[in-house]
Amino acid sequence: MIRIDAAWLATTPLDMRAGTDTALARVVAVFGAAHPHHAYLFANKRANRLKILVHDGIGIWLAARRLHQGKFIWPLAGGANLALQRPQLDALVMGLPWQRLADGGVITVI
């Protein structure tokens, strides 16, 4: 399993024909650098396809996901890039609503 310590969502669409080098160049342009164990998520304009680039400390992984029905819930283009918590990342990749997930439901004080 690939270790992911942080996940970042880019609001600008990415051409899904982009390969590893093009996606890596976009990560550097948008986020400044590709950090080890960070995942960077991009969607196409229709938000029915998703690409995730992960730097595992040794090399680069690029994964793609396509929804056959519906769309990924994606922020408007041109907005600020977002940091995602692990539950949000898991829900987003499954095509589920993810905005209200984070540490919700966690009780820390009795």
PLM feature segments, named:
Residues 1-110:
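Polybasic/polar functional segments that serve as interface/processing modules
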